C-alpha cells in the first residue's frame, strides 16, 4: 500500500505541474488516460496490460462506449468512463453513459474520472437522482489524505469485497434491482397488457390463439429493440409510436395498425417465421397498449434505459425462458397470465447457458463447421471463436 501511495503522489505532482503550466486544456482524452488514469489504476494493483483483467474501450452501438471494463477471476466488477483533464464531471450525461452501460451488463459499479476528480456510482439503483446512486467521490488533492477511500477501487479491495461493504454501510446498495429481474418483470407486464387488450377487443377469438398472438407480437417487438440497439435497424418503434401517438386524432391509422403494415415489410427483408403472417395482425387493439409496451421496452426516462446490445445473452435467454413458460388463463377478473411448469416441459422451453454453448462450439463444431446454418447464438459464439 505504501508503494501505491508513492506512485500516486508522483502522479499528483505531475498533474499539478501540468496545471501550473497552463497546458491542461491541451490534453486529449487518450493522452489523459495514458499519462494519468491508467497509471493510477496500475498503482491500485490492476494489470492494465492484461486483457483478461482490464479490457479497453468496450463498445455499445446504441450509445457510444465505455473506456475500460475491470475483471476479477473472469467476472466484471466495474466499468470506468474516462474524460480529458479538466472535464466537467458534474455533467449528468457523462455519469449516465457509464451507469447505463454497467446496468445493462448487470455490473454493480460505474466509475467516472478525469484524474482531477473521481466518482463511483451504484449502477443497479434505478430510482432517484444521480446523487442517490453515487457511492462516493474524491478529488485528486485527497488521494493521499483519504487513501483508504481511493483504495476501495484497488484490485485487493475487490478481492476482499471492501467496496460492497462500504456501499452497504452507507445504504447505497439497498435499492439494487438487477437487470434480469427488471427486464423479466417488464416483459411479463408487457405480455399482460397485450393479452388483456386482445381479449377485450377480440372476444370471439380462442384463448390459446390470443396467447399465441400476444407472444408473437411481443417476440417481434423485442427482436426489433435488439436490432435497433445493435445498429441493424433504425429506431423505428420509438419514432412510429411517438409520431402516430401524438397525432392520434388526425391519423386514420393507429400505432398497432402501422406496426402490422411494417411487419409485412420486415417479412420480405428477414424471410423468417418471426414475421410471417399471423391472425393477430387482423385483430383490434384500440386502448394504446402497444404504445405503452414500446415505451416499456425503451426503459424509464431519467431512471434507466434498456440497451439490448449490452445485455448479456444469458440474461436475455433466462428472461425469455421464463416468459415462454407462462400460460394465458381465464380468471374471475377476466384474463390472467400464470407460470406453467407443464408447458415448459412439454414444449422444451429451456435456455442453453452461454458456457455450454461455448463448450459445444469450441469442442465439437469449430473443427468441422463450414457454412452450416445454426441458431443465432451458436453462430455468434462461433464467430467469436474464429476471431480469437
Task: Locate the predicted segments by residue.
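Preference for the N-terminal adenyl/adenosyl cofactor-binding alpha/beta module
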Residues: 1-21, 84, 154-388
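A short, conserved, highly charged catalytic patch centered on acidic carboxylates
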Residues: 1-109, 117, 122-152, 158-166, ...
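Extracellular structured ligand-interaction cores
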Residues: 65, 115, 219-221
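Short flexible/disordered coil segments
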Residues: 115-119, 375-378
Amino acid at each position: 500500500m505504501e508503494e501505491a501511495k508513492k506512485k500516486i503522489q508522483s502522479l499528483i505532482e505531475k498533474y499539478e505541474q501540468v496545471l501550473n503550466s497552463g497546458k491542461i486544456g491541451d490534453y486529449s482524452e487518450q493522452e489523459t488516460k495514458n499519462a494519468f488514469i491508467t497509471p493510477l489504476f496500475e498503482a491500485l494493483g490492476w494489470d492494465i496490460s492484461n486483457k483478461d483483467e482490464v479490457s479497453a474501450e468496450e463498445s455499445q452501438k446504441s450509445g457510444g462506449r465505455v473506456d475500460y471494463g475491470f475483471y476479477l477471476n473472469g467476472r466484471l466488477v466495474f466499468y470506468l468512463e474516462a474524460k480529458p483533464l479538466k472535464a466537467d464531471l458534474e455533467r449528468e450525461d457523462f455519469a449516465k453513459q457509464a451507469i447505463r452501460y454497467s446496468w445493462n451488463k448487470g455490473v454493480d459499479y460505474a466509475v467516472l474520472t478525469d484524474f482531477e476528480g473521481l466518482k463511483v456510482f451504484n449502477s443497479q439503483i434505478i430510482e432517484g437522482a444521480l446523487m442517490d446512486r453515487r457511492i462516493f467521490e474524491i478529488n485528486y488533492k485527497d488521494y493521499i489524505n483519504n487513501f483508504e477511500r481511493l483504495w476501495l477501487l484497488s484490485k485487493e479491495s475487490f478481492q476482499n469485497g471492501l467496496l460492497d461493504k462500504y456501499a452497504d454501510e452507507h445504504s447505497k446498495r439497498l435499492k439494487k434491482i438487477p437487470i434480469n429481474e427488471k427486464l423479466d418483470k417488464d416483459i411479463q407486464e408487457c405480455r399482460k397488457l397485450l393479452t388483456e387488450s386482445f381479449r377485450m377487443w377480440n372476444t370471439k377469438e380462442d384463448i390459446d390463439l390470443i396467447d399465441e398472438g400476444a407472444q408473437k407480437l411481443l417476440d417481434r417487438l423485442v427482436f426489433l429493440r435488439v436490432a435497433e440497439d445493435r445498429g441493424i435497424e433504425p429506431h423505428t418503434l420509438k419514432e412510429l409510436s411517438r409520431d402516430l401517438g401524438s397525432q392520434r386524432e388526425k391519423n386514420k391509422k393507429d400505432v398497432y395498425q402501422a406496426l402490422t403494415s411494417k411487419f409485412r415489410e420486415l417479412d420480405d427483408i428477414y424471410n423468417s417465421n418471426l414475421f410471417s403472417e399471423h391472425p393477430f395482425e387482423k385483430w383490434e387493439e384500440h386502448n394504446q397498449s402497444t404504445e405503452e409496451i414500446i415505451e416499456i421496452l425503451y426503459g424509464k426516462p431519467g431512471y434507466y434505459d434498456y440497451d439490448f446490445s449490452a445485455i448479456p445473452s444469458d440474461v436475455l435467454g433466462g428472461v425469455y425462458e421464463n416468459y415462454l413458460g407462462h400460460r394465458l388463463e381465464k380468471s374471475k377478473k377476466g384474463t390472467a397470465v400464470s407460470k406453467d411448469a407443464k408447458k415448459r416441459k412439454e414444449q422444451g422451453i429451456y435456455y442453453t447457458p452461454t458456457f455450454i454453448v461455448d463448450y459445444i462450439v469450441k469442442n465439437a463444431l469449430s473443427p468441422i463447421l463450414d457454412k452450416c446454418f445454426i441458431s443465432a447464438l451458436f453462430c455468434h459464439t462461433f464467430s467469436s471463436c474464429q476471431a480469437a
